[in-house]
Regions:
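Glycine-rich phosphate-binding loops of nucleotide-dependent enzymes
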Residues: 2-243
Length: 243
């Protein structure tokens, strides 16, 4: 069976318009269980829009999204959480007046995941939130809010995890640490799609990347190969990444 046939997510000829602007213009790709796929490209290339359509925040205007063999395009976000898709956001939006622990409890209740519930205590320990578990989310620094956003998604036991700029604002030590956590999640069989501008981080964690421009794929393969492509180097990643 080919990797594409084994995919947990398949996006085919996806279109998303905002007025006359085509944010996605025939985008197609797939991801298999246990794979970390990076979506890269300049601002406005369609990376976050793709995540928003896959997660049910936006309905597609054309094309198809298939998750685990069933059409998922246009399905409401909370229903997709039940089916096994969850995500983080560029700017985390926790319930600021609730404690860290309560935020995760709300995510569990909202997600309604089947199977054994993820241990909140384990998540707090694993993602360095144990010491602030009973403090309001408003008290957290930016890195802690990112980790809370991630733990809320993980609490619902997703089979497909979408990470939108998770690394932004993290220091080098934090980046190395979270890279290890993401790779460990993939090792359990979780499929992960990463939208990110930090190419060093993408290189560290991804198995494969899709480079987008104007809502279309212009390259698919490893980042190591991408940085040798003149079009990718000059227009999307910047020439310094070729060295």
């Amino acid at each position: 069976m080919s990797p594409e046939q084994n995919s947990i997510l398949k996006v085919s000829k996806l279109v998303k318009r905002f007025g006359g602007f085509h944010a996605l213009d025939g985008l197609s790709f797939h991801v298999v269980p246990g794979e970390i796929l990076g979506l890269v490209g300049p601002n406005g290339s369609g990376k976050t829009t793709a995540i928003n359509v896959i997660s049910g925040l936006y309905a597609p205007d054309g094309g198809e999204v298939v998750f685990d063999g069933a059409s998922s395009g246009g399905v409401a976000s909370h229903k997709l959480v039940h089916r096994g898709i969850n995500r983080t956001f560029q700017v985390p939006k926790p319930f600021l007046s609730l404690t860290v622990r309560e935020n995760i409890q709300v995510a569990l209740a909202y997600g309604g995941a089947t199977g054994t519930p993820t241990s909140i205590a384990e998540l707090l320990e694993e993602y360095r939130l144990k010491e602030v578990a009973d403090r309001p989310a408003a008290d957290l620094n930016s890195a802690q809010q990112k980790m809370l956003d991630l733990t809320r998604a993980l609490a619902t036991r997703p089979r497909l995890l979408l990470l939108d700029e998770l690394a932004a604002g993290l220091n080098p030590a934090e980046l190395d640490w979270i890279a290890g956590r993401i790779k460990a999640l993939a090792a359990t069989g979780m499929a992960i799609i990463v939208v990110e501008h930090l190419m060093g981080f993408i290189e560290q964690i991804t198995d494969r990347v899709i480079v987008l421009n104007a809502g279309k794929e212009i390259f698919e393969g490893t980042l190591a190969t991408a940085v040798r492509e003149p079009q990718v180097i000059e227009v999307f990643l910047g020439g310094e990444h070729a060295h």
